[in-house]
Amino acid sequence: MSFEAPTLDRIEDGGATFDLQERLAEGPVLMLWIGASCSGCHDWTELIKSAIDEGAFNNTSMGVVSVHRWAEFESLEDVHETFAVESNDSHYTPWTVVTPSTTTPTFEFGTNDDTGYPVYEAYGNPGTPTLQVIDQAGALVWQSKTYWANETLLGEAISFFD
């Protein structure tokens, strides 16, 4: 399964639109479902950022993408202020932040046929934070709904394909 959705359109986002199928051509993806007011999301963001800085992703082609989960409740400004402003005391995210709407469609991987499910429903209506590993065929292969960041679980996700 795949989807396309807007990003925060920063340099870190790699453009104004994120295409999961295109990104998966580079390797599997660790998706972190986030909310601006979600303390656990802030915690996971900080742990993933530290893991990247410490080289935990150096021996893998896995990329990281944060997906905003609460489009119906939080504004893009809330998401931007929380995850995109490097100079303040936010939870700056140095990887792609995707901002789908409640009606963003999903597509069958490889055929681009509409699945009939919007993105939130297609990925199981994840709460926040939820971590999901998506393999290079677009399949959800691993998931954790642990609220507070956990190094063991992050390590499990990063090494899933080892």
Predicted regions and their residues:
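Proline-centered helix-kink/hinge sites
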Residues: 3-6, 40, 46, 129, ...
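N-terminal "domain-start" segment that seeds a small globular fold
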Residues: 1-22, 43, 102
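Sec/Tat-exported extracytoplasmic proteins
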Residues: 24, 34-35, 49-56, 123, ...
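Short active-site neighborhood of thiol/selenol oxidoreductases, capturing the structured segment around
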Residues: 18-48, 63-67
